[in-house]
Amino acid sequence: MPEEYLNAQKMEKLERIKSRGINPYPATFHPSHTSVQAVALLAELEKQENPPKEILRIAGRIMTLRDMGKISFMDIRDGSGKIQVFCRQNDLDEASIELLKDLDLGDFIGAEGSLMRTRTGEPSLAATKISLLSKSLLPLPEKWHGLQDVEKRYRQRYLDLISNADARQTFLTRSQVISAIRSFMSSKGFLEVETPVLQPEAGGALARPFITHHQALDCDFYMRIALELHLKRLIVGGFDRVYEIGRIFRNEGVSTRHNPEFTMMESYQAYADYKDVMDFLEEMVSSVVKEISGGYTVPFGDTTLDFTPPWPRLSMRDAVKQYAGIDFFDFPTKEALAAEMIRRKLKVDPAKDWGKLVDELVGEFVEPRLIQPTFLTDHPVAMSPLAKQKPEDPRLTERFEAICANMEIANAFSELNDPVEQRARFKEQLEKRNQLRTEESESIDEDFLAALAYGMPPTGGLGVGIDRLVMLLTNHDSIREVILFPALKDREDKGEQE
């Protein structure tokens, strides 16, 4: 950041502070209490007839500053909340009195003193000493309106978090959701593991990968597009229940529901099928919702989402019949289904295969009808190269997606563990993908097929979109609101402060 963007008045104050021999950026300060702890302690002391006069040390950022001559009031905020600091010149040492003159909104201070309640009933710390912990050199966003520019909120998330209590609460909730999922998975006997982000093959999903080059090894790697294939290797290796919460990278479109890097939780359970996983997901999500919100219902936009189990279950074929009026098995080829869609005046991308066209029908007609949590089950084989076929109808797979508020929040299979069938499906999938692309062709993950050939037990696999789940629990309709630093197009004026 060029120095000319720094606030001149704040720079003058900084120099005055330095001239008095004060380090404006000391290495440490040890608070005795957080602001919330201090307020709670005051309430406890007020219950006692003769409470002891305790000396506390608190620290935080100055959010409001009111100078009334010989008395000043400051609201300071730390990670737990805020508390008022009451400064009376008669109670302060000379250095603190001088320092007060050069403090601004945004500065971090440490305050030492005793607890009190003002005449208006405000819990406060009556300060006897003030220490500067960090001098702010740029003005904070205007107090009453906060940070209004949406892109600036995403680009400079630190300002958003300073200004907007709702933003801070969103990311506190996100952390609580992930902690609740980890606790639930542990209670069910799942082992949390870590698998490679850099991979020699881009497998486990139909998505375009990011590619990077490893200088020392002199070879290209892909940023992972799924957690799946390495987790299945661990099932082969003898772990019965494994899961990972990790970042996924897909070099595809950006929207209110898609970010190039996002967080997934994937789990794999030996000796389970997709119906077992359906029950498992239902229990997990409903328990997380209850832990976070206190009940099974949460507001979302103009509606209320109800996660009370059991959730409705609807086959994909029946759903497309019901909402689009098309039985996709009546049109078994790409050409036939495309012709029917064109006849109904629907847009058709000629590059998409039959499975992708079915997916288009689901996105166009089915997902917009599914507001409450619903399981969409039994996808066609063409859409599910890693899932087992249904014995009673081999055109379909043992798969489900959990849909809520018109978007997919989870996806699960009875995992395909026949290495011969898996190779055949990989080949078919690869041929389709390479026909559609002009860049370097992809290849089959031979090591994964080798792992399957050693034997993998019947396994139920699950993937949960953490970002979308957090969207639902924080009442946000954009994924950028729940990712601390979402992907944004580079701006031409980078480095400038508005």
Curated annotation (Swiss-Prot):
Cofactor: Mg(2+)
Protein known as: Lysine--tRNA ligase
Annotated binding of Mg(2+) 2, by residue: E408
GO cellular component, one term: cytosol
EC number: 6.1.1.6
Family membership noted in the UniProt record: Belongs to the class-II aminoacyl-tRNA synthetase family.
Comment on bound cofactor: Binds 3 Mg(2+) ions per subunit.
Main location: cytoplasm
Domain of life: Bacteria
An individual GO BP term: lysyl-tRNA aminoacylation
Subcellular location(s) per record: Cytoplasm
Keywords: Aminoacyl-tRNA synthetase, ATP-binding, Cytoplasm, Ligase, Magnesium, Metal-binding, Nucleotide-binding, Protein biosynthesis
Complex formation: Homodimer.
GO MF assignments: ATP binding; lysine-tRNA ligase activity; magnesium ion binding; tRNA binding
Residues given in the record as Mg(2+) 1 binding sites: E401, E408
Classification via InterPro entries: Aa-tRNA-synt_II, aa-tRNA-synth_II, aa-tRNA-synth_II/BPL/LPL, Lys-tRNA-ligase_II, Lys-tRNA-ligase_II_N, Lys-tRNA-synth_II_C, NA-bd_OB-fold, NA-bd_OB_tRNA
Pfam (any one): tRNA_anti-codon
Annotated disulfide bonds: none
Catalytic activity: tRNA(Lys) + L-lysine + ATP = L-lysyl-tRNA(Lys) + AMP + diphosphate
Transmembrane segments: none
Alphabetized NCBIfam families for the sequence: lysS_bact, PRK00484.1
